[in-house]
Amino acid sequence: MTNIRKTHPLIKIINHSFIDLPAPSNISAWWNFGSLLGICLIIQILTGLFLAMHYTSDTMTAFSSVTHICRDVNYGWLIRYMHANGASMFFICLFLHVGRGLYYGSYTYFETWNIGVILLFAVMATAFMGYVLPWGQMSFWGATVITNLLSAIPYIGTTLVEWIWGGFSVDKATLTRFFAFHFILPFIITALVMVHLLFLHETGSNNPSGLISDSDKIPFHPYYTIKDILGVLLLILILMILVLFSPDLLGDPDNYTPANPLNTPPHIKPEWYFLFAYAILRSIPNKLGGVLALVLSILILMLFPILHMSKQRSMMFRPLSQCMFWILVADLFTLTWIGGQPVEYPFIIIGQLASILYFMIILLILPTISLFENKLLKW
């Protein structure tokens, strides 16, 4: 009798994706982040579902309903902080996952890569709308500032902003629709994840050397299931330390003040994971220019397959490119720091220099160094 795992129409798909999947024998811990992102998504959907049972998307009661969840609902505080800090863990894993892709040249699987970039946009949109829901000061002013950026679009800008707001300012209609979108987007993300995996399994995984590994494959289970479980345990450990010991470490104190349209907070800033993009936005004095730079800072990831000039796929054997890659990482840390600082000297000029360097490294320096490395190796 044939194993049901290999014959059943539904179980067969799971088998080919997670059990009998041929995987390279040398993939490192950097390949754990895909499964960790899957776990993050599951945690976010489950905690979000339980929060939605008690949350009300009305300007008069939204803030109170979040307070009610934390005070009166059984383990409501735990669910709420797991959801808030789960988002931070999600973005840490996302950034590391993208960084891994850049370092090891995984972007040469361009369908998988492009869907990954679309996923990044979708997760960022979801996180932004989620931040608006508690209806604190930073929720309200963050929503006002970020949605207002669309007014920079010529001709249709103002109409578009009012259409998104559902009125002439961020109000009840805005909150209600943001809640609706925040609820539906994770399911769209889940569907996109399946497409992402579908394209990945067409080609098979990349590996640290960047070489074809068809001659040396091992089954995913038990080797990488065990390895992934270790990653998951570490993820949950870090998340729970964050949730139970310092749940507000990554949040903004201003969000514990109910939204007040008549009182602007001294420093409007988004959550930490958007600060690098926010710094790029602020570094350009022109509104439309800033918005374009903001979008391009993420969209530029789609250009990596075109900008790849090296004869080698991975950066494993390219020390000059490695050096530039880590300078890019340091630059992103600098941008994140600048995004959280007030708009004054010397932060303005540091932000502008870091923004220029970000685009310069990706568009000019990395491709040039790759060509130089080809010459060094007489290729």
Curated annotation (Swiss-Prot):
Disulfide bonds: none annotated. Heme b b566 binds at residues 97, 196. Heme b b562 binds at residues 83, 182. It is found in: Mitochondrion inner membrane. A ubiquinone binds at residue 201. Binds 2 heme b groups non-covalently. Its cofactor is heme b. It is a multi-pass membrane protein. Pfam families: Cytochrom_B_C (PF00032), Cytochrome_B (PF00033). Keywords: Electron transport, Heme, Iron, Membrane, Metal-binding, Mitochondrion, Mitochondrion inner membrane, Respiratory chain, Transmembrane, Transmembrane helix, Transport, Ubiquinone. Gene3D superfamilies: Cytochrome Bc1 Complex, Chain C. The keyword Protease does not apply. One of its GO terms (cellular component) is respiratory chain complex III. The chain crosses the membrane at residues 33-53, 77-98, 113-133, 178-198, 226-246, 288-308, 320-340, 347-367. It comes from the Eukaryota. One of its GO terms (molecular function) is ubiquinol-cytochrome-c reductase activity. InterPro entries: Cyt_b/b6_C (IPR005798), Cyt_b/b6_C_sf (IPR036150), Cyt_b/b6_N (IPR005797), Cytb/b6-like_sf (IPR027387), Cytochrome_b (IPR030689), Cytochrome_b_C_euk/bac (IPR048260), Cytochrome_b_N_euk/bac (IPR048259), Di-haem_cyt_TM (IPR016174). One of its GO terms (biological process) is mitochondrial electron transport, ubiquinol to cytochrome c. Component of the ubiquinol-cytochrome c reductase complex (complex III or cytochrome b-c1 complex) that is part of the mitochondrial respiratory chain. The b-c1 complex mediates electron transfer from ubiquinol to cytochrome c. Contributes to the generation of a proton gradient across the mitochondrial membrane that is then used for ATP synthesis. PANTHER family: CYTOCHROME B (PTHR19271:SF16). The cytochrome bc1 complex contains 11 subunits: 3 respiratory subunits (MT-CYB, CYC1 and UQCRFS1), 2 core proteins (UQCRC1 and UQCRC2) and 6 low-molecular weight proteins (UQCRH/QCR6, UQCRB/QCR7, UQCRQ/QCR8, UQCR10/QCR9, UQCR11/QCR10 and a cleavage product of UQCRFS1). This cytochrome bc1 complex then forms a dimer. Belongs to the cytochrome b family. This is Cytochrome b. It comes from Neotamias siskiyou (Siskiyou chipmunk). The lineage of its organism: Eukaryota, Metazoa, Chordata, Craniata, Vertebrata. The gene is MT-CYB.
